[in-house]
């Protein structure tokens, strides 16, 4: 289970932007949530976080997403999981 921060929990529960903005305004750290969101592969949560947290940029997120994708690809190859490998093609 990821949801290690209140912000990440709120994002994963698909709360509206106002809830997310409230947490950010009251000291929530978007970078802590970012790590869990990327590891969970939750694209909707990632898009929402980038939309409401101006400090999170594509330049910051892209390398982490690529690294996670490569780890998943090599894991799929190691496990000989053809359906997972096809997702990358």
UniProtKB/Swiss-Prot annotation:
Look up keyword Transferase and say if it applies. Answer: no
Superkingdom of this protein's organism: Bacteria
Q: Which Gene3D superfamilies match?
A: Ankyrin repeat-containing domain
Q: Name one Pfam family in it.
A: Ank
**ANK repeat windows:** 2-32
Going by the UniProt record, its keywords in alphabetical order are: ANK repeat
Query: What is this protein identified as?
Result: Putative ankyrin repeat protein RF_1157
Q: Which organism is it from?
A: Rickettsia felis (strain ATCC VR-1525 / URRWXCal2)
The organism's lineage is: Bacteria, Pseudomonadati, Pseudomonadota, Alphaproteobacteria, Rickettsiales
